[in-house]
Amino acid sequence: ALRPEEREMVERNLGFFSTADSLVANNLVLAVYKHITNPECRQYLLRQAFEEAIHTHAYQYCVQSLGLDEARIFNMYRELPAVATKAEWALPFTQSLGDPTFKTGTHKDNQRLLRDLIAFYVVFEGIFFYVGFTQILSLGRRNKLTGVSQQFQYILRDESMHMNFGIDVINQLKNENPTLWTEEFQQEMINLIT
């Protein structure tokens, strides 16, 4: 049986992830896809969006399997400050790429694309996701919620590939446009990540 604080941790993680993967899928389809023009990368982005939909379903399955209050869990991004803060942090970075007037081609806009990709892949899909994964997987290592932990293992496998892909795209943009990676911009990215 879970201790009350473990149950709270599971609920908060499911509340965050059920919303976060929807944000990720929307960002991929509505924003990132139109700015990444390499055909192979675009194919991968579509695959990633498909996997995010599967993850969202897996979180819903976990919530239902555990008999948790679905409305409460799925509304945590609105009602629980710890979950809402993460979603609110990510929104400006995802919305700017989805802005129909945004176009790359200038130094400033190319840096904006690079900044938003770093925020999206390194911070949101990297740091924020991995914190939740480690918490749930730690329960599985103690033979608690082994089925949920197994679902998170599968999702972690996918998310590791997503993050690595994103970092590859970021590095390729930096290599193709070395003038974007100024000392000032580097410091901005360090501040973003920390």
Enumerate the language-model features and the residues they cover.
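Non-heme di-metal
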Residues: 1-194
